[in-house]
Amino acid sequence: MQRIDHSLPWSHLGTERTLSVFRYGAGTRKVYIQASLHADELPGMRTAWELKKRLAELESNGQLQGVIELVPVANPIGLDQHLQGSHMGRFELGSGKNFNRSFVELSAPVAELIGDQLGGDAQANIVLIRQTMGQVLDGLPAPLSQLEAMHRLLLRHACEADITLDLHCGQCCGKA
């Protein structure tokens, strides 16, 4: 297992937040799994931590056929937000923005850059699309907030995957 820690910029003085990605296995195929983008949706995070243990076992036994990237805590910003004893993980307190909205829109700029380059070779098309998504992300101006930086990191990992899972649990979770 490889742990990739991304320090989020724009922290408050004397503080730091980190987005941790756990990478298991090797190969050309990749599955990307993130949990708790709404940081108050804790069942997804719990499931991801249990999956983390299982993936470590599978990797140590050589049973993984490809790469699995797991982000059990996809939103360290929201996980750290509390107001008068209540967890506030759905919206960023400073801006009021929903953590699961306002990701960079890639489809239009990617389509424009690719133009008519897609052909009959599906694998070559996948490579071209992923490279172009990376190119678009690289060409963006610097993020203006910690939320923007976090979104871009999550998006970059997801864009490289063959399968992406975003674990959510609605408002009713854990309530009788």
Predicted ranges, named:
Residues 1-176:
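Structured catalytic-domain cores with a bias toward divalent-metal coordination
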